[in-house]
């Protein structure tokens, strides 16, 4: 289902990214605000060049996208790992709970294997119950809890 994004997909990705970012702004107004563009042309081109941005289509319509990064973890006291980080994922709001997200995650898993990654990793806000449940159904487990204190 996933394919590399092309320049012509920019506005569709922007529209989808705004759906997700609106939730981030709602949950963490101390961190997020809605910019004029989440994917200005330069950023979009950079993500395409780095082969990090993928889209999902239904017919000719972009219905989802993912932004992936690969991180090699190594250092003193660390097991060498190659982790594919799922930085952003979105399925069009009106098409959620129809299996498209699961299909996208299956494709991400296949990409991770192709890139010889040892793990898939993502972050999700705990108040996003729907997403937490979805990721758990896809086989993800909670590995850490991030904490913060206002100064």
Report the location of each language-model feature.
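A short beta-loop-alpha structural element at the N-terminal edge
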Residues: 1-16
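Conserved active-site alpha-helix within GNAT-family acetyltransferase domains
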Residues: 102, 114, 126-144
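A short helix-loop-beta-strand connector motif used in the catalytic cores of GNAT acetyltransferases and
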Residues: 42-55, 85
């Amino acid at each position: 289902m996933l394919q590399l994004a092309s320049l012509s997909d920019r506005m569709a990705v922007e529209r989808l990214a705004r759906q997700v970012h609106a939730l981030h702004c709602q949950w963490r107004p101390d961190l997020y605000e809605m910019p004029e563009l989440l994917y200005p042309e330069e950023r979009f081109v950079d993500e395409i060049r780095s082969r990090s941005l993928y889209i999902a289509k239904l017919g000719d319509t972009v219905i989802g996208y993912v932004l992936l990064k690969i991180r090699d973890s190594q250092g003193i006291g660390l097991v060498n790992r190659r982790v594919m980080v799922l930085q952003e994922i979105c399925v069009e709001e009106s098409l959620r709970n129809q299996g498209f997200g699961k299909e996208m995650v299956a494709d991400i898993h296949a990409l991770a294997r192709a890139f010889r990654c040892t793990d898939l990793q993502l972050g999700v806000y705990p108040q996003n119950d729907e997403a937490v449940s979805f990721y758990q159904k896809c086989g993800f487990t909670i590995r850490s809890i991030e904490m913060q204190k206002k100064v």
